[in-house]
């Protein structure tokens, strides 16, 4: 029989007492009262904060949005099919945040920053809050550098600057996403990080955009955040903030970023769905009262940072779909009032074969020529006014039978100016090529050509300049001004090429 000595027993007990670590952990818990339609009502959670993450027994995460006297309204970040009435819920003490790093470049992720492209996990050692405050007035400086889109109509007449917020607005199927994707393609070699946020889009549309980026080598500097049409409303609501957090990570590291939200009206619809299910009082078009704040707090995060903060920038291009050209609806007017201008795409122009279908008359950039290089200002200064006058004259000319020579010439010039603004999709032009194109049209060199010949001639002219006269491009890129030397060189080349082109066309 084994004998136990009393001193051994007391030593063991003493050791155990010394090892005992008295740790009191207070967990704020509650009970599920009701669950369904992506919403759960919880009893308890007395000390939960607005916007705090809560965790359900089976692992689903939710956000506490409604704090009422006898229950808490939680929106679920998942389907929540396994949540049962009476199961427990605990508050985490955290608010929504995502991991951030350079490794996200070239990846397709969801609103929780989890990869959905099947290429494995993304390593990240830092995290950022999904909702973080926008830079204040002292942290900003005015926009002064151009963000070239590669589209003549925009860069010459509705210029976008780094740190600006420019709305792209129009009916469905008018080429809004094409304008945005062309802008991303044009950032190749410009040291600009791009984020494309797809909210409530068809999976096929997002796949098409990603394929375009991969084929054109744009994925290496682009992050795609996608929440499809079948995603829970909570994730569609969070996706733009996730994209903004990723863009901010680079902006505060003294980098230039551009973010496209496609489109915030789908985010507003998801938020409306959540709000109505939470029984918040509906307002205009059944949207909740704070739908303006939903978009303003997102778009205000776009900024050009001050020199003290490293002069990084975040340019926002939200895309809003209108119904039969009605820009006075609730969400379009909200976003118009928040942004620094809008690019209006017209279904009539699109159907008339003018693509990109930008209505130059009612499109505006509130930053203006501050977002253009000097050379572009010199060449394109009057073209917006000329096109507006031409559109007015064209409408008037439909009723007039006999027009004087000056009016006929003005109409002919306007038609050629409109023709040179046409551009194929995914074919952005460099700023030097745009200057050549606009100068040729604005100075009447295209007047001797038929309208059908304009595009062919301009392609030929740009190709000739690129291969045979690289010095023109060098002058513009080094001085950023349209010097007398550059003008003389260009005049000579245009005259020579027009004569050659007309001879070729005759034979």
UniProtKB/Swiss-Prot annotation:
Recorded coiled-coil stretches: none
Keyword Thylakoid in annotation: yes
Assembly information from the UniProt record: F-type ATPases have 2 components, CF(1) - the catalytic core - and CF(0) - the membrane proton channel. CF(1) has five subunits: alpha(3), beta(3), gamma(1), delta(1), epsilon(1). CF(0) has four main subunits: a, b, b' and c.
UniProt protein name: ATP synthase subunit alpha, chloroplastic
One GO MF term attached to the UniProt entry: proton-transporting ATP synthase activity, rotational mechanism
Places the protein is found: Plastid, Chloroplast thylakoid membrane
InterPro entries: ATP_synth_asu-like_sf, ATP_synth_asu_C, ATP_synth_asu_C_sf, ATP_synth_F1_a_nt-bd_dom, ATP_synth_F1_asu, ATPase_a/bsu_AS, ATPase_F1/V1/A1_a/bsu_N, ATPase_F1/V1/A1_a/bsu_N_sf
Biological role: Produces ATP from ADP in the presence of a proton gradient across the membrane. The alpha chain is a regulatory subunit.
HAMAP family named among the record's database cross-references: ATP_synth_alpha_bact
Keywords: ATP synthesis, ATP-binding, CF(1), Chloroplast, Hydrogen ion transport, Ion transport, Membrane, Nucleotide-binding, Plastid, Thylakoid, Translocase, Transport
Binding site for ATP: 170-177
Chain positions of site Required for activity: 363
CDD domains per UniProt: ATP-synt_F1_alpha_C (cd18113), ATP-synt_F1_alpha_N (cd18116), F1-ATPase_alpha_CD (cd01132)
Organism: Chloranthus spicatus (Chulantree)
Family: Belongs to the ATPase alpha/beta chains family.
Record SUPFAM superfamilies: C-terminal domain of alpha and beta subunits of F1 ATP synthase, N-terminal domain of alpha and beta subunits of F1 ATP synthase, P-loop containing nucleoside triphosphate hydrolases
Catalysed reaction, written as an equation: ATP + H2O + 4 H(+)(in) = ADP + phosphate + 5 H(+)(out)
């Amino acid at each position: 029989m084994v004998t136990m000595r009393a001193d051994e027993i007391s030593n063991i007990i003493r050791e155990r007492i010394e090892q005992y670590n008295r740790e009191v952990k207070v967990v704020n818990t509650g009970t599920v009262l009701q669950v369904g339609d992506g919403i759960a009502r919880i009893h308890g959670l007395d000390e939960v904060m607005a916007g705090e993450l809560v965790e359900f027994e089976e692992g689903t995460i939710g956000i506490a949005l409604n704090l009422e006297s006898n229950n808490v309204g939680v929106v679920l970040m998942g389907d929540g099919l396994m949540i049962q009435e009476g199961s427990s819920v605990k508050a985490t003490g955290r608010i929504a945040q995502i991991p951030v790093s350079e490794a996200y470049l070239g990846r397709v992720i969801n609103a929780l920053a989890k990869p959905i492209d099947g290429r494995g996990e993304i390593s990240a050692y830092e995290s950022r809050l999904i909702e973080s405050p926008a830079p204040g007035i002292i942290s900003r400086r005015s926009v002064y550098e151009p963000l070239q889109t590669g589209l003549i109509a925009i860069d010459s007449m509705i210029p976008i600057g780094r740190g600006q917020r420019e709305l792209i607005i129009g009916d469905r199927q008018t080429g809004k996403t094409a304008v945005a994707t062309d802008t991303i393609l044009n950032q190749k070699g410009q040291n600009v990080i791009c984020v494309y946020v797809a909210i409530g889009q068809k999976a096929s549309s997002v796949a098409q955009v990603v394929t375009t980026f991969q084929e054109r080598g744009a994925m290496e500097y682009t992050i795609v955040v996608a929440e499809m049409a079948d995603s829970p409303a909570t994730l569609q609501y969070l996706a733009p903030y996730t994209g903004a957090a990723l863009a901010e990570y680079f902006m505060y590291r003294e980098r230039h970023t551009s973010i496209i939200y496609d489109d915030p009206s789908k985010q507003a619809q998801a938020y409306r769905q959540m709000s109505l299910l939470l029984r918040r009082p509906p307002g205009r078009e059944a949207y909740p009262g704070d739908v303006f704040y939903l978009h303003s707090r997102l778009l205000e995060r776009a900024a050009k940072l001050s020199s003290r903060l490293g002069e990084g920038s975040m340019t926002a291009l939200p895309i809003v779909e209108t119904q039969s050209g009605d820009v006075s609806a609730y969400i379009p007017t909200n976003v118009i009032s928040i942004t620094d201008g809008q690019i209006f795409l017209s279904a009539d122009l699109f159907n008339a074969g003018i693509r990109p279908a930008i209505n130059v008359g009612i499109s505006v950039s509130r930053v203006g020529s501050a977002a253009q290089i000097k050379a572009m200002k010199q060449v394109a200064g009057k073209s917006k006014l000329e096109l507006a006058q031409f559109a007015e004259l064209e409408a008037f000319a439909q009723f007039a039978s006999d027009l004087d020579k000056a009016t006929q010439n003005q109409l002919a010039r306007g038609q050629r100016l409109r023709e040179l603004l046409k551009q194929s999709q995914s074919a952005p032009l460099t700023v030097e090529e745009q200057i050549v194109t606009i100068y040729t049209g604005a100075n009447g060199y295209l007047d001797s050509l038929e309208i059908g010949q304009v595009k062919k001639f301009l392609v030929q002219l740009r190709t000739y300049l690129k291969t045979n006269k690289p010095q023109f491009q060098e002058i513009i890129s080094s001085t950023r001004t349209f010097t007398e030397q550059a003008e003389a060189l260009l005049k000579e080349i245009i005259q020579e090429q027009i004569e050659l082109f007309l001879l070729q066309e005759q034979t």
